[in-house]
């Protein structure tokens, strides 16, 4: 469960998130939609505990989130994620060693499906392949909350379809809260499930959504 209560985030005089109250109680794949600079990354980093908020509170599974928390129960990956210049297979191995719940079999299966060369160093991969490896590591973490920031960046149309299929398979295997941010509108993020109301929450498809009027950042519950 994720709970945000009157969350505001400011950088100096600039307000990026303003008075957001939101509760996500059920497992599902959720979409965070907004143009570049709308505050999507700030929203996800705040939930993950990667940065402190200005005012308000954020809780995940009843635990208050802050940058001081050692284990938030959240796995977050952003676009342009930077890893050590190590072979891809070594990155998967390290991830499994530091996380007892890590699903190494799932990660290996996805590596094979997307024909990723485990011997190739991460920094030598294309943007799309870097994003795919980062996403696989994130999903295989088996955390209760998965946050994916622009995961389809650098993907062509076919790869986007394959990505969402992988996401659905991961969710079926381990139901949890998965939030995917994007600026690309697709069938997975349909605007018909949301109505705009400035800085308020409202029921959408049995759940809730918000519209951040500061920058135009939309949150969609599953259909």
Model-derived features: where do they sit?
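Conserved structural motif at the start of ABC-family nucleotide-binding domains
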Residues: 2, 17-19
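The feature captures the beta-strand-to-loop junction immediately N-terminal to the Walker
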Residues: 33-35
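Helix-to-loop junction immediately C-terminal to a conserved catalytic motif
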Residues: 48
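Conserved ABC transporter NBD signature motif
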Residues: 56-69
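ABC-family P-loop ATPase nucleotide-binding domains
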Residues: 76-133
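Catalytic Walker B motif of ABC-type/P-loop ATPase nucleotide-binding domains
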Residues: 146-150, 155
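Helix N-cap at the start of a conserved alpha-helix in ABC-type nucleotide-binding domains
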Residues: 157-159
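Helical segment within the ABC ATPase nucleotide-binding domain
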Residues: 161-173
């Amino acid at each position: 469960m994720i709970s945000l209560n009157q969350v505001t985030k400011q950088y100096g005089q600039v307000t990026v998130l303003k008075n957001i109250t939101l509760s996500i109680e059920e497992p599902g794949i959720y979409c965070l939609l907004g143009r570049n600079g709308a505050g999507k990354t700030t929203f996800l980093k705040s939930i993950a505990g990667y940065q402190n908020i200005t005012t308000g509170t954020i809780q995940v599974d009843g635990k208050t989130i802050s940058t001081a928390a050692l284990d938030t129960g959240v796995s977050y990956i952003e676009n342009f994620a930077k890893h050590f210049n190590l072979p891809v297979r070594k990155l998967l191995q390290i991830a499994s060693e530091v996380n007892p719940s890590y699903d190494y079999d799932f990660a290996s299966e996805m590596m094979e499906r997307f024909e990723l060369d485990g011997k190739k160093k991460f920094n030598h991969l294309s943007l799309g392949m870097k994003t795919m490896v980062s996403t696989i590591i994130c999903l295989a973490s088996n955390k209760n909350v998965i946050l994916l920031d622009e995961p389809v960046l650098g993907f062509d149309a076919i790869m986007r379809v394959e990505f969402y299929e992988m996401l659905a398979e991961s969710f079926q295997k381990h139901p949890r809260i998965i939030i995917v941010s994007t600026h690309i509108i697709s069938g997975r993020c349909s605007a018909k499930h949301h109505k705009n109301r400035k800085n308020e929450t409202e029921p959408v498809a049995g759940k809730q959504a918000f519209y951040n009027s500061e920058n135009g950042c939309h949150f969609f519950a599953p259909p």
